[in-house]
Amino acid sequence: MSLFHLLRRSVTVAVMSESAPNHTSARRLTQPLEPFVGRQVLVGVSGGADSVGLLRALLAVGALPAVAHLDHALRPESVDDAAWVSDLCARLGVPCEVTRIDVGAVAARRNWNLEAARRLRYDVLSRAAKHSGAEVILTAHTRRDQAETVLMELLRGEGRIRGIPPQRGRVRRPWLNVGRAEIETYLRGLGQDWREDASNADPRFTRAWLRREVMPVLLTRFPAAETALAQVAELGAEDDAALQALAARLTPHTPLDRQPPAVLRRWLAAELRSGGLDFTAEQLRDLAGALNAGQTRHLTLPTGRDVTVTGGHLYTAPCDWPEPDFPLPPDWTRRTRQAGDRIRLAGGTRKLSDVLTDAHLPRAERDRVPLLTDEHGAVQWVGVQPPLWAVGARESLGLPADPLHAAMGEALALAQQAAERQEVPVGAVVLNADGEIVGRGRNTSREDGDMTCHAELAALREAAAGLGTPYLSDCTLVVTLEPCPMCLGAALEARIGHIVYGAANPKAGALGGVSDLLADHWGWRPTVQGGVRAGEAARLLREVFGEVRRRSADTPQTPNAETPAPRSSRSTSASGKPTMLE
């Protein structure tokens, strides 16, 4: 909905209330302060009507306020403001802490604009709250401040329109729905004066310019513009909270290219902020667009840090590549890649450049990946995560096989057995805490006439029977294909500790292939690692389904329980036709 329509939508109600007889009383101002009755609170008081009104209203309801005042030294009169606030607090019997900071000098030294430098105020408030023992910090932001903030967010083109939050940390802003006129009326009724800050009328400051030049024009056409803009902030904050919750549910194995752009932007913002990185709204949109489209993008952030999006991943720092954890043979050499490097893998010899590209490594990082080569210069080991070995290299050093690599080999052998019986080619094994196989399984759905006979369930049953317990929290489930919801549910019920899978499951995957069920809060959460020997697992699937298609083309027929149909899931379709997953 456009800002224009939101303004129009709020005009009727607001104008009716403003045109009605004015029965505004102190009750409207004091009611939001009732949660603070009898509590120690710190109030930021500048001397203006809003903050003075908040102080007087807190005293009226029985709160226990202390005052903090920042003399920002931006005007010669700021010294008089500080003295005025101190005198007011003395007359009211309220503790007062005054701090003087040359905000202009700080802004120049740190290359801030003056509006940004005013954030120093919250540092002052936090220190004063600690000194006074206050539980919360209260500021007197009003509906006018909220409306101005929404306008600034809109004009800056920010991706999120949230306005001023009612609460952030220990800071509370109880008067965001209160108008300035109500506060002035309240103070006049008390016979209380206040100070006027001339900088609030200085058009060099964006907020002051909006207040003096823009809002009067808006109010001429839309008398309830202030209320409407405050409502935009409230609705925007609700929407933002919902989208933030969706972003927080993304797990390391969730495919980012399937997320809505609004969710991606919030996920990216959280990731960048967690690394202490600043960014612009345009950069955030650019990175989110690249993630959504599966593209590669390299950007330099305002702090000078380079970030990269590639292969559906965000890289904010140089990668920490693993070092060899075994003795190096004397004729092996440690180096980085060179033109023409190749490595012999299970599927044949490949260019190292293609291997690193398929691993979606940032281009700038590919020249940093450590390699080990033999006396002939052939690549034997690649220091990616997990490390990649050439065929026979590990064995030539007398090193034990990588447990997960070996376990996936057993699962692939079971998947091959399933394929030979015209089953969906999926195999699974369960490893105990020592890495020993304690359960094996393959798909037998057609063999047994039961579509719940999946490889994972068979392996879990065998492991539970052998170990004498249904709970397998110290065990690892290794399966050639990303589990479906049924099998993931069984693994959760078994309290499996780790899940390792090979190929992604774009038709029925429950770990990101279709939906990431672990994004929800279950009573148990295993760790997940995908992509182990994924190429071999995917190749087996392609071979099986390629044969199915060729056979179907040679002998047209309606798929039935004995003849697998191409491109199916490991369940029965709505039409009753058995399906298989590719």
From Swiss-Prot:
SMART domains for the chain: TilS_C
Binding site for ATP: S46, G47, G48, A49, D50, S51
Cross-referenced SUPFAM superfamilies: Adenine nucleotide alpha hydrolases-like, Cytidine deaminase-like, PheT/TilS domain
GO cellular component annotations of the record: cytoplasm
Region described as Disordered: spans on this chain: 548-582
Location in the cell: Cytoplasm
CMP/dCMP-type deaminase domain mapped to chain residues: 402-525
Pfam family, one: TilS_C
Annotated keywords: ATP-binding, Cytoplasm, Ligase, Nucleotide-binding, tRNA processing
Keyword Cell cycle tagged: no
Entries under PROSITE patterns matching the protein: CYT_DCMP_DEAMINASES_2
GO biological process terms held by the UniProt record: tRNA wobble adenosine to inosine editing
Keyword tRNA processing tagged: yes
One term of GO molecular function: zinc ion binding
Enzymatic reactions: cytidine(34) in tRNA(Ile2) + L-lysine + ATP = lysidine(34) in tRNA(Ile2) + AMP + diphosphate + H(+)
Biased composition range(s): Low complexity: 563-575
EC number: 6.3.4.19
InterPro entries: CMP_dCMP_dom, Cytidine_deaminase-like, Lysidine-tRNA-synth_C, Rossmann-like_a/b/a_fold, TilS/TtcA_N, tRNA_aden_deaminase, tRNA_Ile_lys_synt, tRNA_Ile_lys_synt_N
This protein's domain notes: The N-terminal region contains the highly conserved SGGXDS motif, predicted to be a P-loop motif involved in ATP binding.
Family, per entry: Belongs to the tRNA(Ile)-lysidine synthase family.
Task of the protein: Ligates lysine onto the cytidine present at position 34 of the AUA codon-specific tRNA(Ile) that contains the anticodon CAU, in an ATP-dependent manner. Cytidine is converted to lysidine, thus changing the amino acid specificity of the tRNA from methionine to isoleucine.
Name listed for the protein in its UniProt record: tRNA(Ile)-lysidine synthase
UniProt source species: Deinococcus radiodurans (strain ATCC 13939 / DSM 20539 / JCM 16871 / CCUG 27074 / LMG 4051 / NBRC 15346 / NCIMB 9279 / VKM B-1422 / R1)
Gene this chain is encoded by: tilS
